[in-house]
Amino acid sequence: FCFQGEKNDSHDFVYDAMKGGASALVVEKKIDIDFPQVISSSSRKMMSEIAEIFYDFPSREITTVGVTGTNGKTTTVNILSAIAEAAGQKPKTIGTLTGQLTTPEAPDLQRQIRDSVGSGASFLAMEVSSHALLQHRISGMAYDAAIFTNLSLDHLDYHGDMESYYKAKSLLFSPSHAKLAVINA
């Protein structure tokens, strides 16, 4: 999967992918090489959707809650996990305490959810960063509920302004992502 990152463009590394055994490339712009390519307007979104299909839509097999906001995601996820456990559920959490990224890249995320379902987890609470929302890491995810903790001045180096930051966070609350929304007033 080739896409433009913040610092690098993975289209520049297609020969490494080919040497590594890739049988095709998903690209956002045609590359002048004799190699199978699928051109997508968003390779990241396609990667997320393919990961969901590859892992057989694991978020549909577990009660899933996504938590977003500037602050309080980790605390909220841990409280939800404790409540689920007290209610007799087997919880799993995904976030800053369990990984390097607040929200893992789509293939890693889908694998973690599939592994959780396979090990008997019945409840998933996960942190969902604004970066992950804009980078389509959760495209196709089925959340039973989405929680918004707050929005304050942060990550403006990435988003540019508060309106863009707000719009990124609000993506989690679209009907295609969440059945229920909980907004901290």
List PLM regions with ranges:
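N-terminal leader/targeting and accessory segments in enzymes
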Residues: 1-49
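Phosphate-binding loop of NTP-binding sites
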Residues: 47-185
